[in-house]
């Protein structure tokens, strides 16, 4: 039913959006998820399917793909409507208080409340810029679907953040050799990850950038890197590249939706309320003082946003859902 009105529509089907959908089911809210990508899972599905995630309480280690699969299964407990391949470009509050959401393809959705869980927005990876980069498309990787493609190869990872360091360490026991190229000196990563990296067999090249790819017949053989302090170049043998230079994020038309934005997202209060009544935000979409940007924190913010949406609809409703072990859906 195209004109069906939902209690809550969650924009974004990443980990936080999926868990928010599960929690909204605990609150007996009719729920829809709208995601711009072909499938739910967000950046975790796209960038980290084989990366080991360790910063969620009670889960010592899990791959990104398995985390997304578990969250999707959990989200589907209460049968939310899931719409993919639609990017929401406009949210308008109608005279009756219902929000009209318009997608890039012209589709219209109606909802009494909206929870924004789009992360940093839609994203596009920053591509490697170097001589002959177009000659070796199969050797350049921006995400990893299968670690086995790197087995017994000489691999170079380029980047200096958590993801680049994690991938270098993940590839170390699989690849024949791993190089890590970073244009800076101080890695922008967790202290323990940096310590482990420096104690590993990964060969680190700080203050270096990739300048040229060398090979024949579309087969990469080596790369030329340059020190940005001395301008001295050197060539290192490399069969595969993993590039982690961050992403270009696009909040799209959100700036026109009426709520307050800051440098790192949508401004919310401690109830995940935006400055527009009825619209809430959580996960990397939201920003507030002393925010922690890890999945575990977002999994906490999602239920807060849903509870606020529930109270917006029903001011006399309980402040929070009954814990799942006591919920009627899981008893008997």
UniProtKB/Swiss-Prot annotation:
Regions crossing the membrane: none
Binding site for FAD: 35, 43, 48, 88, 123, 284, 325
Annotated signal sequence range: none
E.C. designation(s): 1.18.1.2
A Pfam family reported for this protein in Swiss-Prot or TrEMBL: Pyr_redox_2
Cofactor(s) listed in the protein's UniProt record: FAD
Keyword annotations of the record: FAD, Flavoprotein, NADP, Oxidoreductase
Cofactor binding summary note: Binds 1 FAD per subunit.
Molecular function terms from GO: ferredoxin-NADP+ reductase activity; flavin adenine dinucleotide binding; NADP binding
SUPFAM superfamilies: FAD/NAD(P)-binding domain
Reactions catalysed according to its record: 2 reduced [2Fe-2S]-[ferredoxin] + NADP(+) + H(+) = 2 oxidized [2Fe-2S]-[ferredoxin] + NADPH
Origin: domain of life: Bacteria
Subunit structure: Homodimer.
Family per record: Belongs to the ferredoxin--NADP reductase type 2 family.
HAMAP family in the record: FENR2
Name of protein: Ferredoxin--NADP reductase 1
